[in-house]
Amino acid sequence: MRVIAIVCISFFSLFNIAYSQILENKNVSFLTIQDKLLENPLSGGVDNAQIGEFDLNQDGINDIVIFDRAGDILIPMIFEVSTKKYRYAPQYKQIFPKIKDWVVFKDYNYDGLMDLFSCAFNTEGIAGIEVYTASLENQKIVFSKFDMKKQFKVLYFPTGGSSSVQIPIDYSDLPSIDDVDGDGDLDILTYEPGNNRVTWFQNVVKERAYSKDTLAFVISDRCYGKFIESGLNAEIKLSGKMDECASFLSPEITTRHAGSTVLSVELNGDSLRDLIIGDLTNNGVIALYNGGTNSQAWMTNQLTYWPAKKDSVNIATFLGAFDVDVDHDGLRDLLIAPNQRSISENANNISYYRNTGKATAPNFELQTRAMFVSEMIDLGSGSDPCFLDYNQDGLTDILVGTEGYFIRSSNLRNARLVLFENIGNKQQPKYKLVDSNYLNFNYFSLGSDAHHSFSPTIGDLDGDGDLDLLVGENQGQFFYCENIAGKNKLFQFNKPIYPFQDLSVRSNSSPFLVDLNRDGLLDIVSGTRLNTNDSNNQACGSFYYFQNMGTKSVPHFDPDYFKPPNTNCLGKVIVNSFSSKSYTSPEVIDFKGTYKLFSGNIFGEIKIIDNVEGNVQGHFSIVDSTYGNVQEGERITLSLADIDDDGILDMVTGNSRGGLGIYTTTFKVDGSVDNINLLKDYVEIYPNPSSGIFKVKNSFLKPIRISILDVVGNIYSSVIVDSMNSYEDHLVSLNSGIYIIKIQTINQLAYVKWIKI
């Protein structure tokens, strides 16, 4: 046994544990309504998945990274060898560059690290392909953008003489990056913008004996495989000749709609690269079989309902196919997912076809239509959570408003309020889905005057001691549900009133109830979809304020937001936006008599806004534009509460993808910043090393949180122990290696290295 003094700054650097500015993801359990424990509940949901392999923890085993085009966010999933399951690992988000629209994971320089081929349209500002080269620096993965020393940092090809242009690709498409000719370097297959033929951009690095860290492309074939796609639908016509491009009846169609995906893959074991094609107009994928050679592809057969009618892909819409070894059996499996933002299946939307055959005779069999997503909270699209205690048992529950589930052949959304009850205890929350359609709110989303994007908040508007419900929605008005249960009783609401007092913020209301002017009456602060203009049509703000002009028992609001004390320019704060779209979502917290305003926005940033107290008609100040460096993707929403009784506020987040995240903030409940000090006391860990059973001994007589982390900060266990000086843990199932034992009180922190043998 040895005593370890805690802890020097170099220790934090050594183990790369993110602290301070990056908020820590909270490990909270969630159960389905059938009592199934979700394995990755707080992964944030998935709408438009693109899936690739990447060895995230450098253990020699490829993991999975999902890029969701809806929100432009990466979702890292570590493969655990012992369980053969994937575990959400959000700490790895920090290593990747900002990706937009699409990404393909391929190792072009064969150094064992996957590089990133991605869309340049919304980064470089040109329709092209950018490449991020992965490398290791001090055992840390870093990326650098590949540069051909042209005007833009994108891939170019020569057009004659000294001229060259970028390899063009529409930002809505998805190319294939693959060694199609079998010469040992990666080529590119894509539809050029406006063209109904696939172009082969051949990589000539091997042919020209260039170094392996180089990329060089030429056009090898502007009708790869000799097939063409209809410009009107997903129909594909094959050529009867190996050296002649197919054509439709005269007049020949040579243009097409934007929206196609291409995957070069081995489908039948003949060593020739076949294709899987997805199209904007198709709810399935089409397989094209190569009857030519690798250097002269000729697609001679097609299967329009791949892999067979019985288990064919049927997902709306615009599908992408991704070949990865999901189960690590050495065979390439296929995952299929929709890639059309906003108008595609947004639940149970990743089909997994396992290769049950051999490398020389692939056979793809459907395993599930909800790969990864079945283990997440995924409520469709557009989640907006609110902490509350609906059953008044002293535990913090979660009510989530949603934009809704996609409904085929309809412009409607099946939007809901979804209730998760806290069935844990004061120190260890545990949530269970208890009502997937709380108060039957989906009724309002399915009619001719459809409402969706519900945004709930609570407060005692009528002064009777219980908490009423105000719900924002896509049209910018509000539903009001009066709670008639009485104080400290299970919520019971009257029939919703809509529109509540004719109040409107024009679109996507996101209300918060707070007595902002301190007159004893709850006012309404609301976010909105669009930044606002004043009565002179000058840009002025991102939040609306409706002051309560009624009485304690009878609230009254004037719908005229230009009429003081109302305003559509609250605080004169303009949140950064995209084409005026800001999607603000305010949360006002009273820190010992001083208000702070927190808000999400369209870019997935959390703003902290100060100078609010006693300044309703004045200018607020944004004091933190990217609080916590939270990475949940676009349209982040939030709610704050201390859900584990440790004196520190926790934050639940929603996003455009319909999932949830939970974080520990840096704010104590009194508003002071949680500047955690290093523990001055001594901690004993024994035995160390050990096979998985160890004891933690310390001298504190106060609640202590003990967490077990790996060296990159992933949490394996976290418990709170009250008034203790000894604690024993059993972690026999952990893999051998170095772990960190994190010991934390309300204002003190220690990290101790523990070796599992």
How does the language model describe each region?
Residues R2, I6, G128-E130, I524, ...:
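Detector for intrinsically disordered, low-structure N-terminal pre-sequences
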